[in-house]
Swiss-Prot record:
SUBUNIT field: Part of the 30S ribosomal subunit. Contacts proteins S3 and S10.
HAMAP family: Ribosomal_uS14_1
PANTHER family xrefs: 30S RIBOSOMAL PROTEIN S14, SMALL RIBOSOMAL SUBUNIT PROTEIN US14M
GO biological process per UniProt: translation
Classification via SUPFAM superfamilies: Glucocorticoid receptor-like (DNA-binding domain)
Function field: Binds 16S rRNA, required for the assembly of 30S particles and may also be responsible for determining the conformation of the 16S rRNA at the A site.
MF (Gene Ontology): rRNA binding; structural constituent of ribosome
Gene: rpsN
Family under the similarity heading: Belongs to the universal ribosomal protein uS14 family.
Protein name: Small ribosomal subunit protein uS14
Gene Ontology CC annotations of this record: cytoplasm; small ribosomal subunit
Length: 101
C-alpha cells in the first residue's frame, strides 16, 4: 500500500488538472498560434506560467485504484500488475483468462 498522503496529493493534482484544463488549453492555443502577434503569444505564455504547477496534467501520476501503487500499472484496467494478476486468477476481470499455448 502506498502512503495515503501521496495518494491524496495525486487526487488533488487530478482535481486541479480538471479545473484548469480549459484555461490552460486556451492559453496554450494562443501561445502556439503563429498567426498571433509576438506580444499576444508572450502574454499568453506569462499567464500560463502563473497558473499553479499542479494544474498541469503531466503532474498527475497513474496509480493503482486498489493499492495506490505508482509503478507497474496497466492503463486499461487502472490496476497494478500484482492486483491485476490476483483479480484475474479469482475471475473478477471479465474476459481475462490465463494464457496457455
Amino acid at each position: 500500500m502506498a502512503k495515503i498522503s501521496s495518494v491524496e496529493r495525486n487526487k488533488k493534482r487530478e482535481r486541479m488538472a480538471a479545473q484548469f484544463a480549459a484555461r490552460r488549453a486556451k492559453l496554450k492555443a494562443i501561445a502556439n498560434n503563429r498567426e498571433a502577434s509576438p506580444e499576444e503569444r508572450f502574454e499568453a505564455s506569462l499567464k500560463l506560467a502563473e497558473l499553479p504547477r499542479n494544474s498541469a496534467k503531466i503532474r498527475v501520476r497513474l496509480r493503482c485504484e486498489v493499492t495506490g501503487r505508482s509503478r507497474g500499472n496497466y492503463r486499461k484496467f487502472k490496476l497494478c500488475r500484482n492486483k491485476l494478476r490476483e483479480l484475474a486468477s479469482q475471475g473478477q476481470i471479465p474476459g481475462m483468462v490465463k494464457s496457455s499455448w
